[in-house]
Amino acid sequence: MSTGIWIMIVIIALLVGAVGGFFFARRYMENYLKNNPPINEDMLRTMMLQMGQKPSQKKLHQMMTAMQNQSKK
């Protein structure tokens, strides 16, 4: 086989791998978010009520801010 054909095969294989990897990663992230949804204020409010605390809007906002800052680290 000529060198040009080998180069075309390599380029096509790289493109197929990149497209396949994109769709695999997308499906993985969709499944991950479905199984582990991000925590929102309603979930925090329910969790605090279950622990016997009375959740105020200020306390919920502080906890959400702290969790967002922690996830950025």
Swiss-Prot record:
The chain crosses the membrane at residues 5-25. It comes from Pediococcus pentosaceus (strain ATCC 25745 / CCUG 21536 / LMG 10740 / 183-1w). This is UPF0154 protein PEPE_0872. InterPro entries: UPF0154 (IPR005359). It is found in: Cell membrane. It is a single-pass membrane protein. The keyword Methyltransferase does not apply. GO terms for cellular component: plasma membrane. Disulfide bonds: none annotated. Belongs to the UPF0154 family.
